[in-house]
Amino acid sequence: MSGRRERTKAANRAAILAAALQVFAELGYGATSVRDIVRRTDLASGTFYNYFPDKDAVFRALVEATGDEARRRVRSARRSARTAEEFVESGYRAFFAFIVEDPARFAFMRSNLETIRDRFGDAVLPAGTEELAEDLRAAIAAGHLAPVDVEYCAHAMVAVGLELGARLAERTPPDVDGATEFATGLFLGALERHALTVR
């Protein structure tokens, strides 16, 4: 009985998240109500509150899940890099490709960029920046990157990725190759100039 109950709980939570993804994409965060989300499910209206206290909580859950998966893919791509170019290019390409690959997630992000950045950035930014800093230190130690100020570099690379990702989401069609090439060229140039100044 316990196993069935857990499966039901997991299915209900997944149904709420899937419905919320669609509604937030269509209406945007500000115009969406809990009632709008529940209407897209087969659940009773009170069931929502067994899983989330309000729309903020379900929105945050979507942002966190998206951020977790994006970080996993980006980090996996970066760790296979053996040169500075591979390190920068692979991370940005993995991130930009992730943004556009799922139409529902892409629509959600496209409709809620400002809300994600302004109200829920704390759900994803610190962890992503710290992971990038760790990977930068490892790449420097392995000789794949010249020594840099890791804190500055990590924050700058994350900021550029987020801003270009936002612009990517606004373009039709989204240009993953163009965004990747621009970000890679920008940081390779900066890394090369920095390497020359510290020699």
What does each model-identified segment do?
Residues G3, A97-E101, E130-A141, V158-V160, ...:
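C-terminal peripheral helix-coil segments that are non-catalytic and often amphipathic
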Residues T41-F52:
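Short hydrophobic/aromatic patch on the recognition helix
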Residues D56-V58, A104:
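A secondary-structure capping/hinge motif
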Residues D68-R71, R117-A142, E151-H155, G178:
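Amphipathic alpha-helical packing segments from all-alpha helical-bundle domains
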